[in-house]
């Protein structure tokens, strides 16, 4: 029932930002394009080339007017609503995902623009409403004072899934007459988009989100075929269109008998050491070490004498970015 392990991406040459000033004269004239990652000269040049190529990239999507990713305008500098720093950081994520290979990153960007125009994830996030059965499966929280990139969290509460077969019969089928994808898929993508509105792409400590997958009272041996198909589709979409946005993925209340699966994947090389570092596989629900006791209900070893459902009471308020609102309005006019 978990979203399966994504294909690992190695990130050679990426180092954390350092306070030590670079005194190399050959690097003084290099533009500082991003603040979250220290780039080599070659990496910086490749990023600049990719940014400069954006107008042509947009032309190749078939609709250059759709220039939005995660609610921000991704286009050339000087245009209204283009925030250079945010744009650069988003483009960098696509470049890192392709190991700084220009052509591959360029193709990934083209495909993401196309997918976003077709799927309309902003509508799923901010315009559409979903059945309570779906809304009860996930929630977004935001915590202050937690460790780096553990501030924004999406919770996947599979224990609230009472009847997987019935739910996926009801919400797991595509309804192409209305929107692209099934209601479940649109709900899940919408959850992700809303979570991304809470991060700061230019802040090294808050430029990614964390995910929690809670398997309490869930059988991992009997997964509904509809859920398997939906999970596979979600992983493909996330892998292609949401690169470098996950800091840590917590798998909690995992039955001991299933814990070996994660270790096995690592042993045979399906999970790189870099990707493995993002995983926390726990037999319990104790998350206090990462998110703090005061933020959590008792079920997660928190100090709050409340149930898991109390997370919904502390759900983070999300708002569409400025340019997202413009694109949502434009899409509505196009439909009319």
Swiss-Prot record:
Q: Where in the cell is it found?
A: Cytoplasm; Endoplasmic reticulum membrane; Microsome membrane
Which GO-annotated molecular functions does the record name?
heme binding; metal ion binding; phosphatidylinositol transfer activity
Provide the catalytic activity annotation: a 1,2-diacyl-sn-glycero-3-phospho-(1D-myo-inositol)(in) = a 1,2-diacyl-sn-glycero-3-phospho-(1D-myo-inositol)(out)
Which BP terms does GO give this entry?
Golgi to plasma membrane protein transport; phosphatidylinositol metabolic process; regulation of establishment of cell polarity; regulation of exocytosis
How is it placed in the membrane, per its record?
Answer: Peripheral membrane protein
* Bias type Basic and acidic residues, positions: 1-30
Required cofactor names: heme b
Its protein name is: Phosphatidylinositol transfer protein SFH5
Give the source species: Meyerozyma guilliermondii (strain ATCC 6260 / CBS 566 / DSM 6381 / JCM 1539 / NBRC 10279 / NRRL Y-324) (Yeast)
Q: What is the lineage of its organism?
A: Eukaryota, Fungi, Dikarya, Ascomycota, Saccharomycotina
């Amino acid at each position: 029932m978990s979203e399966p392990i994504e294909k690992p991406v190695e990130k050679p040459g990426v180092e954390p930002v350092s306070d030590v000033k670079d005194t190399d004269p050959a690097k003084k004239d290099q533009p500082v394009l991003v603040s979250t990652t220290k780039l080599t000269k070659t990496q910086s040049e490749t990023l600049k080339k990719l940014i400069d190529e954006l107008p042509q990239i947009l032309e190749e999507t078939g609709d250059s007017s759709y220039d939005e990713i995660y609610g921000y305008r991704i286009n050339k500098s000087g245009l209204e609503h283009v925030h250079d720093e945010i744009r650069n950081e988003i483009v960098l994520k696509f470049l890192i995902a392709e190991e700084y290979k220009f052509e591959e990153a360029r193709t990934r960007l083209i495909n993401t623009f196309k997918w976003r125009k077709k799927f309309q994830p902003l509508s799923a996030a901010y315009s559409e409403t979903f059945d309570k059965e779906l809304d009860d499966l996930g929630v977004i929280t935001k915590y202050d004072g937690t460790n780096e990139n553990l501030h924004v969290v999406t919770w996947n509460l599979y224990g609230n899934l009472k009847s997987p077969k019935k739910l996926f019969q009801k919400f797991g089928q595509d309804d192409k007459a209305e929107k692209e994808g099934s209601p479940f898929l649109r709900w899940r993508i919408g959850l992700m988009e809303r979570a991304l509105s809470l991060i700061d792409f230019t802040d090294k400590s808050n430029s990614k989100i964390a995910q929690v997958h809670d398997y309490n009272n869930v059988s991992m041996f009997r997964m509904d075929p509809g859920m398997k198909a939906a999970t596979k589709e979600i992983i493909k979409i996330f892998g292609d269109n949401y690169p470098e946005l996950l800091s840590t993925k917590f798998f909690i209340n995992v039955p001991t008998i299933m814990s070996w699966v994660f270790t096995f994947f690592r042993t045979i090389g399906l999970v790189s050491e870099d990707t493995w570092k993002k995983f926390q596989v726990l037999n319990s629900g104790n998350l206090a070490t990462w998110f703090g006791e005061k933020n959590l209900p008792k079920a997660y070893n928190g100090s709050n004498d409340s149930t898991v459902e109390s997370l919904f009471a502390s759900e983070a308020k999300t708002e569409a970015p400025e340019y997202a609102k413009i694109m949502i309005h434009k899409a509505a006019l196009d439909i009319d």
